[in-house]
Amino acid sequence: MPQPESQPQMLIERLGLLPHPEGGHYRETYRSTTKVATPRGERCASTAIVFLLTAGQCSHWHRICADELWLHQGGGGLLIHELSPAGAYRRTRLGLDLAAGETPQHLVPAGHWFGSEPAAGVGWSLVGCTVAPGFEFVDFSLARPEDLAPIAAAFPNWRRLCLATEPQVLPRLSPPATQA
C-alpha cells in the first residue's frame, strides 16, 4: 500500500494523467461517438475525464458552454466555487462524508464560472467530470478579474483561483495532443 504522500504520484502514473490547463492533472476517459447540434456547432453528446488535485493546487476560475457533472472518486473533500451568470456565489463540498455536509456529485450548469480546490487539510482529491454536450477546448474560457467582480466581497480569496492574473502560466492553455 503506497504511503499517503505518494498516492497522488501513483495515481498520475497509473492513470496516465497529464497536466491540465486549468490546474491539476487529468485524462480524458470517454468521448461519445454520437454527435449533437449546438449553437456553437456539432459536438460529441458527452465526454468524461478523471481529474486530480493535490494540496496547494487548484482548478482556476473558468467556464464552459455545457453542463459539467462532478463525481467524487477518491481522496478527501473538494471545494467547488461557483458564480452564476446572475452573480450568485455558491460553494459545494464534494466528497463522501455526508455527515460533514459533503455530496458525492454536483452539477455545474453551463455558463457558470467555477474553480475548485482540495478542502483544508486534504492531501488530494480524485474526481470524475462528465460534460454534456461534450467538452471542446474552443468552448473553454479562463476568467479575467473583471469577470469575477461580483464575488469580491463574498469570497475575498477569489484571486487565488484566477489563472488570468498569472500570465506566465497562460502558454499552457492549449488542447492536449490527441492520443491514438
Task: State where each predicted segment sits.
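Non-catalytic, conserved peripheral segments adjacent to functional cores
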Residues: 1-106, 115-116, 122-123, 133-136, ...
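Extracellular beta-helix/beta-solenoid repeat scaffolds
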Residues: 111-112
